[in-house]
Amino acid sequence: MMQGRGRMIDVNGISLHVEDHGAGDPVLLIHGWPDSAFLWRNQIPFLVSHGFHVIAPDMRGFGRSSQPEDVAAYALRNAVADVAAILDALGLDAAHLVGHDWGAAVTWLTAMFHPGRVRKLVVLSVPHPRSPHTMRQKEMFWYQLLFQFAGIAEATIQHDNWAWLRAFSRGDGDHERWIADLSRPGALTASLNWYRANAAPRMPGPPPTLPQVTAPTLGIWSTNDYYLDGVRMEESGAYVEGPWRYEQIAGASHWIPLDAPDRLNELLLDWFR
C-alpha cells in the first residue's frame, strides 16, 4: 500500500478504517471476503497517479474496522448505508464505485438505491442480484452452506494451519494476509457473518423487482473464477438502464485485482475517463 492517510471514520455506530489517498475525481473501492482494503494495493497508487481521489475502506467485520457481534449487523443494507456514510464523512456527493465479491454486491445495491451517489460503476466477479442462478452456480456455492454452521465453519477453516482456506482458494489470493487478519479475536466469525446475514438457505431471494441501475456500468469476470459463473455477469446488462459493458479477463482467478492488476487498471482508467 502506498503512503497516504489511513484513518478511522465513525459511521452508523461503528468505526471503519479507511485508506484515503490523492485528490481529484473520487473513486471508492469496496473489497469482499476474506479481504480488506489491502486487496487494492495495485490499484490505489495507479489511480492516484492519474489524478483520482481514491478511498478504500476495510468493510465492517474486516481488517481494522469494527466487528459488530450481531449477525444482522452484516446485512447488505447496512453495508450500503456505510458506503453512503463514508461519502458523507468525506464531504463527497458522489463517486465512481468499484466492488469485488461481496463488495460488488454492495456497489450494485448502492447504485440501485442511491443512484445520485454513483457516477460510474465497476463490478468485479459478482453479477446483478436478480441474475438467475444457473445449476453450475448452485454447485459453485457449496461452501456457503458450510459457512452457516457457527463454530463448525470456524474450526474447519482454521484446522491444520488454515489448510481449508488454502485449499479452497486453490493457491490464489492473499493467504498470509488473510490468515493474519482472520486470526485476530472475533475476526473470522465477523467475516463469516456476511454469509450468515445474507446467504442463509432459509432466507428469501431478492425481491421480484429492484430499481434499474442507471449509472454507466462495467462488469468484469475472469475465466479462472471457481466461485462465480460468468454467464450471469455477461447477462447482467439486462438490469442496467445506463450504458453497459462486459469484459472478460482470461487466465485470472477470482482475485482479479491481484492476478491481472495491469489489465484491471487499464479498464478502470478507460471507463472513468
Q: How would you name each of these model-derived features?
A:
Residues 17-66:
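Conserved HGGG/HGGXW glycine-rich cap/lid loop of the alpha/beta-hydrolase fold
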Residues 252-261, 265:
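Catalytic histidine-centered segment of alpha/beta-hydrolase-like enzymes
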Residues 36-37, 105, 252-253:
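A short, glycine- and basic residue-enriched loop/turn
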